[in-house]
Amino acid sequence: MESTVAHAFHRFALAILGLALPVALVAYGGNGDSRKAAPLAPKAAALGRSMPETPTGDVLTISSPAFADGAPIPEQYTCKGANIAPPLTWSAPFGGALVVDDPDAPREPYVHWIVIGIAPGAGSTADGETPGGGISLPNSSGQPAYTGPCPPAGTGTHHYRFTLYHLPAVPPLAGLAGTQAARVIAQAATMQARLIGTYEG
């Protein structure tokens, strides 16, 4: 009789211990730490909207197969040649705008080309082409097109900046041309990449 009672008591004690142990583990985090565990961050789907992934290669780049950065621009892309835009290669994950100017011009930077609305992604152009999706604005000559380097004789080496800008939104540019439009674009931009070519007057 005593052994039966003892056996029943033993089973009862084990049952109580089995219930108490999970409670203790919850109270102390399962590892002796009484601090509460940080809640898990909700997934994007739980927020009722999908989160876009960060684009790969999200850095602006611009280059040209016709000349290296800091090297002379071939004559065919100047006023002494065919006066056409050089071929360009770029990466603009969010789209952008292109400004080509000459900061060494006598009075103020001379803007040779402005292109807005360049399509997002990587792209390239052949000789004389405008970047995909782009619209040319009037340059310092008042022409909505590319005009090549044509520095005055005897003014030395001029540096031509091919600057690719990221614009979160296209700023108001109606009625603007040349340096005015270029300044507005530069002020509205959040990122830029630059290629420089030279030409001697």
Swiss-Prot record:
CDD domains: PEBP_bact_arch (cd00865). Residues 125-146 are annotated as: Disordered. GO terms for cellular component: extracellular region. Gene3D superfamilies: PEBP-like. It comes from the Bacteria. InterPro entries: PEBP (IPR008914), PEBP-like_sf (IPR036610), YbhB_YbcL/LppC-like (IPR005247). Belongs to the UPF0098 family. This is UPF0098 protein Rv1910c. It comes from Mycobacterium tuberculosis (strain ATCC 25618 / H37Rv).
